Amino acid sequence: MVYILIAILIFGVLIAVHELGHFLAAKACGVRVNEFSIGMGPQLFHKTKGDTEYSLRLLPIGGYCAMEGEDEDSDDDRALGRQVWWKKFIIFVAGAFMNFLTGLIIVICLYAGAQAFYTTEIVELNPDFPQQGEDGLMPGDTIYAINGERIYLKSDVPLIMGLGDTGTIDMTVLRDGKKLDRTLTKQVYTDENGQEYEAYGFTYGGIVEATPLNRLQYSWYQTMDYVRIVRLSLQMLLSGAAGVNDLSGPVGIVSTITEVGKETEAEAGFGAALESILYFAAMIAVNLAVMNLLPLPALDGGHVLFLLVNGIAVALFKKEIPSKYLNVINGIGFALLMALMLFVTFHDIVKLL
């Protein structure tokens, strides 16, 4: 039960942080905010300060930032619709920025006590590895990229190598500050027990002592890795390598957090379980940031796309696109988004049965 509550709290905090981003940006840009609410449902507490009503509501599952002129036309000069394009842009992307920043801060806190980090240094080559030496690989080379994907962390190597593994990879390594391109092919090797196995023939993963600077560096790498995971997941979805049934909604994510928490607690205690959940929370925060910036109606990225289209219309025809069309498009997009959410939630529940 405790992990379910933690999962719900994580969702609530991340959504509230997202709305806080919109709120702070709106205030900074001079846009009137009619209500800023933490939580949903019946009001537990509210206070009006200036033009804004601040609310605390019963259900800890998010919040909202209701701006003047957000969903309707308004004659108020402080209405969202009457602002210049760059102010709208800042307001629209501020929520995603706050989610990304939250994910980064969580990772920074988790890495604050790190004593060392694994690197992508090649530490050993199989004696039968066919490409040793100046024209191939050498111990001490640092893996920089695989198949065009930048490698930041040790965990990136198996992730990227496992994507559409054909038995051949294009690898870029750093040696004495220079980038060297190599093409590697899996070979058949024999282990100490005489068993044959197929591998690329190199071992990687040096160790570097943690410092205040590289703690920040590796925190950034880890956060950008979460961005890449979202991108790769979307690519797999669009290419057909993954289906809609592979998606997880809030129910599935709560189930995953609960499972991770219980398994880790059984193996290493509650502290380790909480640490694992916080890593997961950081990934969810970054996921929310990226997904909200997709150029789809009803999402922040959709609003940014409309800004671009509207700017083109003004440049070409000297006339803005009426906001009523935006409202219709957003309404349709929201309905489709809710339909997808219901579908994913249904499948999450079926998986639990």
Features from the language model and the residues they span:
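Alpha-helical transmembrane segments of multi-pass membrane proteins
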Residues: 11-15, 66, 99, 283-293, ...
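PDZ-domain C-terminal substructure recognizer with occasional recognition of PDZ-binding tails
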Residues: 144-145, 159-199, 203
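Conserved PDZ fold ligand-binding element
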Residues: 133-155
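Small-residue-rich helix-interface/hinge motifs
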Residues: 2-75, 291-312
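Residue-level signature of transmembrane alpha-helical entry/exit and packing/kink sites
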Residues: 3-7, 83-92, 276-280
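Functional transmembrane alpha-helices
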Residues: 79, 83, 189-288, 308-332, ...
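Internal alpha-helical transmembrane segments
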Residues: 28, 52-55, 59-124, 330-332
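Membrane-helix cytosolic exit motif
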Residues: 106, 110, 338-351
